[in-house]
Amino acid sequence: MDEKMLNNILDEFLQKCKQKFGDDLISIILFGSYARGTAVEYSDVDLLVIAKNLPKRRIDRHKVLRDIVLEFIYRYGINISPILVEPRDLSLKSINPLICGILTGYKIIYDRDNFWKNYLERIKPIIKRIKPIFIDEEKEWKIADLI
C-alpha cells in the first residue's frame, strides 16, 4: 500500500474513532512495519488507541472496534490491528514491553493535549535505566537487568 492510501486509511480510522469514542479518545499511534517503513504486501496496520472508559477485560476491549476493523478488511483488504489501552494503563512504575516495541518506530496520528508526547518525556529516564533489549529468538522485549 502506498503512503497516500495509508494516510487516507489512517484519517478515516481516526474519524471513525472520534465518532465512536467522542471526548474519551486521547491518542492514536501508528507503530510496527508501516511506521518503520518495512511493511510488505500483507502487513497489518498496528495502532495503539488510547481512550478513557474502555472495558476492563482485554477481550471486551477487542470487541469495541471490531465493526470498524471488519469494515476496513472488506472495503480495503487491509487488516487494522488496534490495541486499546486507557491512560492509566501506561504506568510510570513499570514499562509495558509493548511500549519498547512502539519506540522502535511510531507515528502520531492523533494526540489530544500532547498526552503521548508528554508520556514519552516522562518515561525516557525509565527506559534509559531499565535498558530494554529485544530477544530475537523469542520475539519480545526483556529488561536487561532481569535476564
Curated annotation (Swiss-Prot):
Binding site for Mg(2+) 2: 44, 46
Transmembrane is among the record's keywords: no
GO molecular function: ATP binding; metal ion binding; nucleotidyltransferase activity
The protein's Enzyme Commission number: 2.7.7.108
Reactions accelerated catalytically: L-tyrosyl-[protein] + ATP = O-(5'-adenylyl)-L-tyrosyl-[protein] + diphosphate; O-(5'-adenylyl)-L-tyrosyl-[protein] + ATP = O-[5'-(adenylyl-(5'->3')-adenylyl)]-L-tyrosyl-[protein] + diphosphate
InterPro entries: NT_sf (IPR043519), Polymerase_NTP_transf_dom (IPR002934), Type_VII_TA_antitoxin (IPR052548)
Cofactor binding remark: Binds 2 Mg(2+) ions.
Matching Gene3D superfamilies: Beta Polymerase, domain 2 (3.30.460.10)
Residues given in the record as Mg(2+) 1 binding sites: 44, 46
Enzyme type, top EC level: transferase
Signal sequence extent: none
Pfam families for the chain: NTP_transf_2
Keyword field: ATP-binding, Magnesium, Metal-binding, Nucleotide-binding, Nucleotidyltransferase, Toxin-antitoxin system, Transferase
Family statement: Belongs to the MntA antitoxin family.
Function: Putative antitoxin component of a putative type VII toxin-antitoxin (TA) system. Its cognate toxin might be MJ1304, which it might AMPylate.
UniProt protein name: Putative protein adenylyltransferase MJ1305
UniProt source species: Methanocaldococcus jannaschii (strain ATCC 43067 / DSM 2661 / JAL-1 / JCM 10045 / NBRC 100440)
